Amino acid sequence: MILELDDVSAGYGTTPILRDVNLRVEAGEIVGVMGKNGVGKTTLMKTVIGLLDATEGTITYAGEDVTAAGADERARAGMGYIPQGREVFPKLSVEQNIKIGETVNAGSDDLLYDEIYDYFPILQERADQQAGTLSGGQQQMLAIARALVSNPDVLLLDEPSEGIQPSIVDQISRDMKRINDQLGTTILFVEQNLGVIRELADRCYAMERGTFVDTVGPETLADEDALAEYLAV
């Protein structure tokens, strides 16, 4: 088991958001978390990466208790994070953005420059272009590449389809499958786009009001109508 959350709660100030979350992710899996806006998906991802402290419970990564570890320590341990909204550095070039991701694993022989340009060739073509001038889909590719270049064991993606045209969403979903298949990278993502959930996830947790209410397996993931019920579509 590469990632475990046991009875994890978290929030902002005195406002609780996550309540007694239990999650299991095996190495090499692609696991989704689905739910409508406002159910706590982004809070979950910030808590997993360490940008937000868990107020209760335990987070275990690769067999180690990382509950008290900060985001930088978790990143060095092998977590890569792609936040909602991508958060690329708009005034820096594509290449400079990617080099920022390299600092997590500076000096390593395991950096994945060749691989990221294979997955996202448009980034190599536009290496000198300011990141802020890229399209939304290209910025998402850049955010993934920046997280991937340090060769993390786990990628955490927060709403990877948000604000991106459908054809590019499909392309990014295929790229994430290739990354998982070829590199063995474990992926945990949160999403409310049914197409992305069905395309990517091996299994999925359904989230409501800050906690998981069900685990969805392959049979339900293949049934679009059944899956839509979890999002009240």
At which residue positions do the language-model features occur?
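Conserved ABC transporter NBD signature motif
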Residues: 57-65, 77, 111
